[in-house]
Amino acid sequence: MNEYQRYLMEEFADEYRERSMSRRDLLRRAVLIMGSVPAGLAALAAVGCGGDDSPEAIADATKPPQPTAAASTSAVAPSATSAAASPSTTTAGPGDIRFAGPGSELLGYLARPAKAGTYAGILIIHENRGLNEHTKDIARRYAQEGFIALAVDLVSRAGGSKSDTAANTGALGSAKIEDLVADMKAYATYLQKVEGVKAGGIGVTGFCFGGGYVFESAIASPEVKAAVPYYGICRLIDKLATSKAAVLAIYGALDNRVTSQSELVKAELAKTGRPSEVKIYDGANHAFFNDTGASYNAPAAADAWTNTLAWFRANV
């Protein structure tokens, strides 16, 4: 398992132990993330969730879900009110975008302030379920605050995020880390060329799985001037000191699995010579910012939002 596969497997193992995920769903996600039944079962054993699953149970769990009338959340062809595929678009308001990336067409959702002008650009990286309406809503919130925001879709190489969130998670977990880092670099370059985006660099934020790729982007992309990862793992702590970004790292105190890294992150960020801060919210757990989930913590989310906006305004 690579670092992100282990991160995902540990998260879903916790959900299974807390009875918020069924054994069937756990099995399916493990197989999709690891790419095969044997690898999925081995990963479950490695995170303490091995079991004597019957061949019938495994076969049932790994069957794709029946098609439903629910619409896919993947990007659609731009409409008259959507932002066009070209970065030179002058269309105000939100819309789906697509452009040629390093390995496939890259998809996303762009939101901009209604009033024409020059604004700081922000990339938003979704959780492990893929690009969804919650993440698009965050992009619109940034636009209302005076930013041009692009919510990326890191499932793009697999055709884009779908309504089947387990499949989205599987695509993210089985992807090569270097491919997703390359895609994030391409999103950063694209956003810098969007009409109205302030020259000289962008900001990036993300949540959960996306929080990890905020750290990746802060290390790999010189265009990133400011970064705000929410409860994300830092895979390359030993390289964090090379980042040129101003980093505000946000954690929940109850999220022990991720927050255990916070002191190491703080120490490495102090070596960058750039503004940095680590903020841990008492009483908040993993995914506390997501107002559609069970872990939502309204006071912590509101304060984190205020601090995030201030960070980007000061550093982008």
Language model feature labels by segment:
Residues 256-262:
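Conserved alpha/beta-hydrolase "acid-adjacent" motif
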Residues 1-25, 45-47:
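N-terminal secretory signal peptides
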Residues 249-251:
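Short beta-strand/loop motif that positions the catalytic acidic residue
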Residues 186-243:
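Primarily recognizes the serine-hydrolase "nucleophile elbow" in alpha/beta-hydrolase
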Residues 48-59:
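Bacterial lipoprotein signal-peptidase II cleavage site
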Residues 275-316:
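C-terminal catalytic histidine-bearing segment of alpha/beta-hydrolase fold enzymes
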Residues 25-48:
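N-terminal export signals
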Residues 15, 22-32, 58-70, 88, ...:
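Serine-hydrolase catalytic machinery in alpha/beta-hydrolase-like enzymes
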